[in-house]
Amino acid sequence: MDPCECSKTGKCNCGTSCTCTNCSCKCCKKSCCSCCPSGCSKCASGCVCKGNSCDKSCCQ
């Protein structure tokens, strides 16, 4: 099962303040944190989020 609700509802909610609408942000597989840091176009598959964004080391 996809841990990210994005694929089903078009909305990905990560905790209390990070929300992805219409899947415009790439969701990180493991924690479904939706927003990549500035300058990062895509999060690597299975990367782990730090806070409300992907760590830069998981960008690809």
Swiss-Prot record:
Residues 29-60 are annotated as: Alpha. PROSITE patterns: METALLOTHIONEIN_VRT. The keyword Cell membrane does not apply. Residues 1-28 are annotated as: Beta. A divalent metal cation 5 binds at C33, C35, C36, C49. A divalent metal cation 4 binds at C32, C33, C43, C47. It comes from the Eukaryota. GO terms for molecular function: metal ion binding. Keywords: Metal-binding, Metal-thiolate cluster, Zinc. Pfam families: Metallothio. A divalent metal cation 7 binds at C49, C54, C58, C59. A divalent metal cation 6 binds at C36, C40, C43, C59. A divalent metal cation 3 binds at C14, C18, C23, C28. A divalent metal cation 2 binds at C6, C12, C14, C25. Class I metallothioneins contain 2 metal-binding domains: four divalent ions are chelated within cluster A of the alpha domain and are coordinated via cysteinyl thiolate bridges to 11 cysteine ligands. Cluster B, the corresponding region within the beta domain, can ligate three divalent ions to 9 cysteines. This is Metallothionein A. It comes from Cyprinodon sp.
